[in-house]
């Protein structure tokens, strides 16, 4: 069942039919394809290319196809080349020869281009809503757990921070992701419908009308670019990759924190699994799967970049390969965002363990150096003094605050009784710009 064949002597082989067909994956574009066709038919009637009665018959037929698909009466299956063929052939079967006028002034090249832009735009707004849900979960988790913990560099305990500071770093990441997606929408918000195969059409059509009907801000500037542009999908895949990278980093920390080596958090049973052989195991599989699926989205980005790198203008069948990877990335990002929101909303903090971890690792060493600077010593000299104290403490299994004043004075006579209050862990967060964290 094809929309072409007049110039061919021999039938297409079954092997080629199967190899060429995209129906099994581009069927998810059925709504966009029907919506685009309805806008196209309205425009053809407005421009006097179709009669008013023909317009109504075709639109009614398209709506009936949409309703039957939505209600499960019509299954998207069979020996069709793609979703466009499926809908047009079913339309002709329903309304007769008038349905053959649907494709007047249009190519599948601009048809699939507008379908993909509509889908990409719609799904991006949907993903933004998933990000908004995650941002709310992060904010609630941070605000409801006022606890201090170690901050890390090089995965080594570094300085005292609040849990809120740590979690709001991820808020900043995902908020950037949202801004990036909004920028992607701004760039892609142009209609390619009316570009034809590559050089427009001899019909006096109204591209601006269909652009408005379909909710685009304008028409594309160049016909050839309009049908062959997949930059917006690559840009979205790049944005999706960054979202997954941020989810993966957060997942990695949840995996570490839930281990007995850290024991900072407890991931709920709802987002954990067990072992078939080790009865004691409770594995952070939700976080591990998010971390693992990140490479899958990266692969979709690299796949489309590689597909597009050597294609001459204008449309080439290579571009059919834009869909499976993009659709898979969309599904992966949506599921990963949803799972992360669920995992964080049920996360339990082990606050005592977090606080106790602060007491190990000399997390107040920087504050001790600042103390000496406030007493008049140059910071580099203070850095050296505190480094020597830390070495002594390590060798003697003590903390800086455990040393008596007399011992501290053997390293520097600027130390006084107020050093203990100055380097107390919670007090260190109440000075200077740190008060804002």
Swiss-Prot record:
Pathway: Amino-acid biosynthesis; L-arginine biosynthesis; L-arginine from L-ornithine and carbamoyl phosphate: step 3/3
Biological processes per GO annotation: arginine biosynthetic process via ornithine; L-arginine biosynthetic process
Name this protein carries in UniProt: Argininosuccinate lyase
CDD domains: Argininosuccinate_lyase (cd01359)
Gene that encodes it: argH
EC category name: lyase
A matching Pfam family: ASL_C2
GO cellular component terms attached to this protein's record: cytosol
Family: Belongs to the lyase 1 family. Argininosuccinate lyase subfamily.
